[in-house]
């Protein structure tokens, strides 16, 4: 397949996407796609899993987000538009992380990317204009913080087209036509999509912008459609049937992968694009996949600086012995359980050492002890590590 899915959501798009990263990667591999772009809502949490499993099955990973885009820090504008942001190279991935971090600092309710943040960290980044809830889409037909959605049958006003042109020019000034694309989606059953795609085709020619096809994937298989309604209803105070009624458009569309290039090209033609426009939009996904060449930065294993030339394993064992000596002074009765104590401690130390976690335990102990010395409250901890003898 020439088509590469760039607009994809997994379970890391919380309460919206369905299917694990691994399920999505396996699905596109079976369909014959050579790459996959994942764009979770406002986070990069799936990227490590994407790289790991994509490499296993021979698929190229593309790292992005579907950002909440718009004014920040304003409670009155909580309905943010959407924007696809992707890393092209190492610098771009660092900038993508900076953008995401700043979005959580600036935002109210949703992690929102401001135009200023996007412009400041634009190097190595490419942008897709977004879905029918994007800034460009909502400028044309309303929605989100730009007012009520307008029916496509009402037409698009000259004023809306002029505003859209100014916003397109802003993106072009920042990214140029090499890094900014108009996103056309594959849903001929949705009137809004048809109206937008037709207008995007006109704007693309006027401003010299390439069209890019997406499937707005939210689940790996078409049969998973019903699960999205369940997920949405669980998130909001509605029943499944109420939610399907209130947002029926989302469940009428197949938010899954096309099974061939012909399928998505036919869908795009069904929205009003010419066949040549549809074919070019599909081919552009492959061009973008070639442009995105990111390998995630790898952290070096934590190594704790030990004393007296000891290894971390030796240091941890010494600390365990010191801890035992401290506790039998506090509670002499424990001395009768010395054999039991050291048998259990030995088992735990072997497991910790085998997993190369000695440095982690030493660093954690150093952090906790330092906090105590500065009269900073430290909780008792939870879980198997906190409850262990070590």
Where does each model-flagged region fall?
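Extended substrate/RNA-proximal surfaces in nucleic-acid metabolism proteins
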Residues: 1-35, 41-187, 193-207, 225-231, ...
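Non-catalytic structural connector segments
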Residues: 1-2, 136-137, 144-147, 269-384
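Short conserved micro-motifs on helix faces and helix-strand junctions that flank
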Residues: 4, 37, 86, 213, ...
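Gly/Ser/Thr-rich beta-alpha loop segments that engage phosphate groups in nucleotides
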Residues: 19, 39, 385, 389
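Conserved short loop/turn motifs at secondary-structure junctions
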Residues: 38-44, 184-192, 219, 303-309, ...
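Residue-level "edge-of-site" marker
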Residues: 41, 67, 215-217, 302, ...
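Conserved phosphate/anionic-ligand binding catalytic regions in large, soluble enzymes, centered on
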Residues: 92, 130, 212-221, 376-390
């Amino acid at each position: 397949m020439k088509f590469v899915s760039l607009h994809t959501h997994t379970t890391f798009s919380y309460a919206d996407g369905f299917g694990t990263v691994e399920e999505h990667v396996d699905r596109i591999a079976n369909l014959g796609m050579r790459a996959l772009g994942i764009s979770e809502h406002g986070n990069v949490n799936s990227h490590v899993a994407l790289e790991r499993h994509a490499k296993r099955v021979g698929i190229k990973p593309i790292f992005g987000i579907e950002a909440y885009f718009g004014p920040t820090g304003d409670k009155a504008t909580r309905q943010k538009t959407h924007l696809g942001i992707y890393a092209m190279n190492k610098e771009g991935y660092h900038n993508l992380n900076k953008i995401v971090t700043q979005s959580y600092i600036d935002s109210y309710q949703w992690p929102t990317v401001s135009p200023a943040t996007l412009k400041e960290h634009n190097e190595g980044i490419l942008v897709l204009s977004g879905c029918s809830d994007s800034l460009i889409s909502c400028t044309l037909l309303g929605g989100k913080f730009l007012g009520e959605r307008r029916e496509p049958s009402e037409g698009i006003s000259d004023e809306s087209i002029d505003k859209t042109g100014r916003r397109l020019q802003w993106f072009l000034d920042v990214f140029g036509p090499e890094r900014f694309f108009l996103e056309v989606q594959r849903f001929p059953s949705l009137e809004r999509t048809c109206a937008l795609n037709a207008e995007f085709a006109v704007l693309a020619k006027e401003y010299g912008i390439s069209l890019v096809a997406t499937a707005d994937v939210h689940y790996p298989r078409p049969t998973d459609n019903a699960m999205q309604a369940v997920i949405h209803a669980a998130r909001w105070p509605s029943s499944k049937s109420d939610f399907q009624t209130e947002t029926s458009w989302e469940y009428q569309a197949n938010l899954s992968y096309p099974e061939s290039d012909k399928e998505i090209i036919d869908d795009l033609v069904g929205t009003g694009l010419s066949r040549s426009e549809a074919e070019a939009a599909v081919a552009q996904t492959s061009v973008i996949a070639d442009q995105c060449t990111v390998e995630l930065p790898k952290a070096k294993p934590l190594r704790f600086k030990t004393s007296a030339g000891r290894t971390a394993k030796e240091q941890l064992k010494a600390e365990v012995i010191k801890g035992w000596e401290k506790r039998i002074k506090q509670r002499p009765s424990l001395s009768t359980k010395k054999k039991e104590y050291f048998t259990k401690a030995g088992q735990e130390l072997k497991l910790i050492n085998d997993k190369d976690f000695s440095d982690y335990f030493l660093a954690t102990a150093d952090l906790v002890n330092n906090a105590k010395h500065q009269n900073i409250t430290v909780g008792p901890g939870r879980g198997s590590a906190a409850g262990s003898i070590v």
